[in-house]
């Protein structure tokens, strides 16, 4: 059943929040229609276009809670993962420049008690630096985490 998979992607508190949003925007028949689903998604911080909504409601007028949860869970998970990546990036981007430099990486390594040689730190930058500017942008950092499956 898909709901079990959903429970693995988001927390019980998030599932409870989805339930509260569903209960707030459901129709009198206990299910959600095309109009109210848009409100529900927005309340959860998710934006869907008209075409995506049409796909959800293909050949039906309403969806039940389990369907709503199955649809919204991966979207919430993506938002959470991206937010976690941004938070991790900001820990490395010590000066808020939008980049992780060699000095940023070295400072973090020292603060974590990770003794790394300069050459190892430069190699770490080099592996993540996709455009060759000798620093890691937020996009490069996130791509590295996805590529290495560190999430």
From Swiss-Prot:
Source species of the chain: Dictyostelium discoideum (Social amoeba)
Domain EF-hand, chain residue ranges per copy: 80-115, 116-151
Name used for this protein in its record: Centrin-A
Gene behind this protein: cenA
Main localisation: cytoplasm
Family classification: Belongs to the centrin family.
Location within or outside the cell: Cytoplasm, Cytoskeleton, Microtubule organizing center, Centrosome; Nucleus
Presence of the UniProt keyword Cell membrane in the record: no
Function field: Plays a fundamental role in microtubule-organizing center structure and function.
Pfam family, one: EF-hand_7
Keywords from the named record: Calcium, Cell cycle, Cell division, Cytoplasm, Cytoskeleton, Metal-binding, Mitosis, Nucleus, Repeat
Entry-linked SMART domains: EFh (SM00054)
GO CC annotation terms, alphabetical: centriole; centrosome; cytoplasm; nucleus
Binding site for Ca(2+) 2: 129, 131, 133, 135, 140
InterPro entries in UniProt: Centrin_CML-like, EF-hand-dom_pair, EF_Hand_1_Ca_BS, EF_hand_dom
One biological process term in Gene Ontology: microtubule cytoskeleton organization
Domain of life: Eukaryota
Alphabetized GO MF terms: calcium ion binding
Other facts: Binds two moles of calcium per mole of protein.
Chain positions recorded as Ca(2+) 1 binding sites: 93, 95, 97, 99, 104
